[in-house]
Amino acid sequence: MSCRELVILGCSSQQPTRTRNQGAYLFRWNNEGLLFDPGEGTQRQFIFANIAPTIVSRIFISHFHGDHCLGLGSMLMRLNLDKVTHPIHCYYPASGKKYFDRLRYGTIYHETIRVIEHPIDKEGIVEDFGNFRIEARKLNHLVDTLGWRITEPDTIKFIPEKIKAAGLRGPIMQDLLRNEHVTVNGKTLYLKDLSYIRKGDSIAVIADTLPCPSIVDLAKNARIMLCESTYLEEHSHLAESHYHMTAKQAATQALAAGAQQLVLTHFSARYLNSKEFEIEAGKIFPNVTAAEEFRSYPFPKNPSSK
């Protein structure tokens, strides 16, 4: 079974602290590495996390404020240095194309990796392929900003006791999957009676924003909702003026979305203890954690979920 986890590579906002680097978030999932908003120093954070950067296959930039993208250039150069053979897909708001190019080509180096750009100029499904469906929606920030929902496909799971009772095994199982029915000893057996659909898991990544309807749409029933909460309620006036959320607001959005787990991040440097965010949000949404540098949040596949 492939590794399925969120790894926090950084969880500060614009200004890093002694214990928190600028944000960067890695989802290891279905043999891919999904890297979100690599801030300054992300390449080095991989070393401290003891994770090979070569796992990265897709990079998502929510918007082009520096703390969400300054690590992009060095990450691409590192992947180039490591001679990765898989393509690197990059997703970002189309309005930020010039900033993407500046980050990618800001220094002299010989690029040999294959970078596939996905500049996004409209909301909805960005890609739908074997491993994932990628959805983007606009958030409410000071510049064009995207939130993300990543969903794995549904899968058909056989019900072991029914398969055993029917006496099915071997190649006929593939026939059953392909044709949705088989005939055994003159009796027709149907796939729908011997199996169930396992709904694919979803994760949501909510970057800088005020509360808005897109958040609930993206995080609906998500296994993990990774969400910015730059401020505590005592500084809600700052959150509003800078187009950010408080921990309480993030928790309210998670509750409305029916998310299973909320991971708060993007903490202002004014706060030394991120546990205060957990306490504030936990009054509304109990299954909440304040992100910690290099902490891992597994979300193992539940084979019996329907």
Swiss-Prot record:
Coiled coil: none annotated. Binds 2 Zn(2+) ions. Zn(2+) 1 binds at residues 63, 65, 141, 208. Gene3D superfamilies: Ribonuclease Z/Hydroxyacylglutathione hydrolase-like. Its cofactor is Zn(2+). InterPro entries: Metallo-B-lactamas (IPR001279), RibonucZ/Hydroxyglut_hydro (IPR036866), RNase_Z/BN (IPR013471). GO terms for molecular function: 3'-tRNA processing endoribonuclease activity; zinc ion binding. SUPFAM superfamilies: Metallo-hydrolase/oxidoreductase (SSF56281). Its EC number is 3.1.26.11. It catalyses: Endonucleolytic cleavage of RNA, removing extra 3' nucleotides from tRNA precursor, generating 3' termini of tRNAs. A 3'-hydroxy group is left at the tRNA terminus and a 5'-phosphoryl group is left at the trailer molecule. Keywords: Endonuclease, Hydrolase, Metal-binding, Nuclease, tRNA processing, Zinc. Zn(2+) 2 binds at residues 67-68, 208, 266. The active site is at residue 67. Zinc phosphodiesterase, which displays some tRNA 3'-processing endonuclease activity. Probably involved in tRNA maturation, by removing a 3'-trailer from precursor tRNA. Homodimer. Belongs to the RNase Z family. This is Ribonuclease Z. It comes from Chlamydia abortus (strain DSM 27085 / S26/3) (Chlamydophila abortus). The lineage of its organism: Bacteria, Pseudomonadati, Chlamydiota, Chlamydiia, Chlamydiales.
